[in-house]
Amino acid sequence: MSRIGRKSIPVPAGVDVTIDGQTVKVKGPKGELSHTLAEPITVERAEDGQLNVARPNDERKAKELHGLSRTLVANMIVGVTEGYRKSLEIAGTGYRVTAKGKDLEFALGFSHPVTVVAPEGITFSVEKPTLFHVAGINKQLVGEVAANIRKIRPPEPYKGKGVKYQGEVIRRKAGKAGKK
């Protein structure tokens, strides 16, 4: 991961980065994020305003954490400037989603509607009854919430019914062969 870790991180205008020991705080137009880095990794500000992630030695653990830490800090900067968004689609007869305030209510073939409460920092938007978006500034949280929603009714391989990411290709199976 050292090739990724060696790259410097550009800090755009309007983003304030505070480094306090192992804790990195990033504040931007969309919000504020903070992350505590693993022990051997340090972040320092270069003269040109960019951030550099450094490791003290070439031990295996330090090498593993070097690229990871650089990517996490870079994702925080992208999150507070642009944000992250995952789009999900619903396929199936009678399957749909509706917005109930900040939360989502799904009709997915169960005997009851399933309600998903929006965690702090996550916003839901429903474009169509079969297409909705999960958005936020924390990439990990956006992906986790989207994965938990998909887990409610994952797409099945025979008809493709269920909740899937937009653009996801579902491997289909042939149905059982009829009698001859």
Swiss-Prot record:
Subunit (UniProt): Part of the 50S ribosomal subunit.
Gene Ontology cellular-component annotations: cytosolic large ribosomal subunit
GO molecular function, one term: rRNA binding
Alphabetized InterPro entries for the sequence: Ribosomal_uL6-like, Ribosomal_uL6-like_a/b-dom_sf, Ribosomal_uL6_a/b-dom, Ribosomal_uL6_bac-type, Ribosomal_uL6_CS
Function: This protein binds to the 23S rRNA, and is important in its secondary structure. It is located near the subunit interface in the base of the L7/L12 stalk, and near the tRNA binding site of the peptidyltransferase center.
Organism for this UniProt entry: Salinispora arenicola (strain CNS-205)
Alphabetized PANTHER family for the sequence: 60S/50S RIBOSOMAL PROTEIN L6/L9, LARGE RIBOSOMAL SUBUNIT PROTEIN UL6M
Similarity section: Belongs to the universal ribosomal protein uL6 family.
Keywords: Ribonucleoprotein, Ribosomal protein, RNA-binding, rRNA-binding
Annotated protein name in UniProt: Large ribosomal subunit protein uL6
Gene Ontology biological process terms from the UniProt entry: cytoplasmic translation
Top-level taxon of the source organism: Bacteria
NCBIfam families: L6_bact
Pfam families, sorted: Ribosomal_L6 (PF00347)
